[in-house]
């Protein structure tokens, strides 16, 4: 899935739910009607798809500050210049707001590399 398509899906789900705290999904299931407390296959697929785009992305200070309450969900490393880099996920879920922020960071990095 292209990064722009994934970003559109995230924005659509945030609009549908009304906030970004909900775990993202790759299917058309309505997060408001699901009652399961288990991590669904769609949530795992969503997190995996986002990770594919954001792995090895350097985060800004603002990104880190926004992710701080949930930073334990991410695998991070320090780059050679002291930057914080996303290397993986420690959970099989990712909130819509975190996914949106991480994809925006990946887009910034891609734009800077192309510039």
From Swiss-Prot:
Sorted UniProt keywords: Plasmid, Virulence
Pfam family membership, one: YopH_N
Gene3D superfamilies registered for this protein in UniProt: Protein-tyrosine phosphatase, YopH, N-terminal domain
The keyword RNA-binding belongs to this UniProt entry's keyword annotation: no
GO molecular function: protein tyrosine phosphatase activity
Induction of its expression: At 37 degrees Celsius in the absence of calcium.
The name this protein goes by in its record: Yop proteins translocation protein M
